[in-house]
Amino acid sequence: TDEEKDYVLDVVMKREYATGSIVNTEAGIGMDDRWKAKVFGLRYDDYTRLSAFANLNNLNENQTPGADGDWSPKKQTKGLLTTKQTGLNLNVNNSKKTFSLDQSTLLEWSDKNTVMQRRSETFSKDGSILGGTLSSNDLSDFTLTNNTFINQTLGRFLLSTGHHLVYTDQDDTSLSADSTYQTDIINTDHRRILSTSKRLFGNGHFGLSANLFGSGNTTSLYANYSFN
């Protein structure tokens, strides 16, 4: 009998078929002046993957998508959060797989408003004593987040570097009012606190790995840094 033979079919896709793009959009409005709009775009080929997005809403959501456009919602449970975001993700490789770049940048503007109100009543022989407390907080925040990772292989050497950078700019306004009264006001107190903060912080590394003798043993040297 003839022996059965195994055949392997090697298919190489033409470059024009390995290139594509995707665009997703979503928008809506609702009651109580609620609104949202977001868009995601992706362009890819054999060696490059580039995506960009924007997200605007006042629904207490600060969402960011993954590299494929899957949105992962995050909820702000208290107050009203208005968010404006835009971001970019870039992944680059070469045909020999000796170079890779992963780059992501996110810019976010947010305004958070929280209002709390409390009333109390204390009974006494001279009549009820009423109390009231009102507090509000307005926080405006800008955040820039940048991540860069690069790997380069040169013969037996692997060079790597990674950097994480964050810049924040915040304006915080707090108002509070306390009052106690019976037939007339007994006590009242009003406070207003303003604060501003700007901060730049980050961390990163530089690395060198070498397989000098080809035995599988690798020698590595890393330098790390951080600042705030």
Could you describe each region identified by the protein language model?
Residues 12-14, 37-43:
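Feature captures outer-membrane beta-barrel proteins of Gram-negative bacteria and organelles
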